[in-house]
From Swiss-Prot:
Cell compartment(s), UniProt: Mitochondrion; Nucleus
Similarity comment: Belongs to the complex I LYR family.
Gene this chain is encoded by: Lyrm4
UniProt-recorded name of the protein: LYR motif-containing protein 4
Main location: mitochondrion
Pfam families: Complex1_LYR
Amino acid sequence: MAASSRAQVLDLYRAMMRESKHFSAYNYRMYAVRRIRDAFRENKNVKDPVEIQALVNKAKRDLEIIRRQVHIGQLYSTDKLIIENQEKPRT
């Protein structure tokens, strides 16, 4: 993978992770983070530039979907789940 492609993929990964953490619903947030990690790990060994570009284009479309869904989720937010209200253990 060319250096510019690698940088573009890493930037896209970071943007998707950052945006998915804005989901107000815990289940959506955790699902999005898990799905993004799994998808990028699954495709980390792809070497074909054409396939890489196709995956980058798909990820860009998915990022826009995440942004839209985050916005919609913020408009129609619900109460937090019990698991979200728990304090983190002190170490």
